[in-house]
Amino acid sequence: LAAVNEEKLRDFGDPEIATRIAQYELAYRMQASVPELTDLSDEPESTFAEYGPGSRRKGSYAYNCIMARRLCERDVRFVQLFHMGWDQHKTLPKQIKGQCSDTDQPTAALIADLKRRGMLEDTLVVWGGEFGRTVYSQGTLTKTNYGRDHHPRCFSIFMAGARVQPGMTYGATDDHCYNVTENPVHVHDLHATMLHLLGIDHERLTFK
């Protein structure tokens, strides 16, 4: 296929053919790099100990955190991790323990790992979701079973790396965590901050 494309490029000199050749080559390089990327046999035991239980299990959050670091090492520009199942309208006491166990250690390990390798200055880590949960319970309240409802009025995210000022909090809620009372942040403000940290002027991307 490459030989045919090169022949057509010589015959017609069409820049779109050259672009298509480059796309095919990039796609091949990306696919060819996957086996090496996903082979964790070169990781020392200390890596798995740092990222915690489950870090050897493919598809687990801890495993994916290691994969995220390996992708960043290979200059992948954007990496997104998911951890599902936070919609706890009931059985929250049981579920939240498992989810925190899944995410706390690997998340901290990923940030520490990036910093130790000198990569955190050039990497922006953003942790968040699409909304928060109510501070009050939902459903029948017992010691072992209750839930929390959707709460889009206020919630928290955190950012690390990319010259983010560490240890700083911004914004506040009322005593019931129901409404924002200080320094509300619109999603556009969040986007502007993220773009600024990446060296991009957000106003050049803003259109009415």
Language-model features and meaning:
Residues 1-208:
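Ligand-binding pockets and gating/stacking loops
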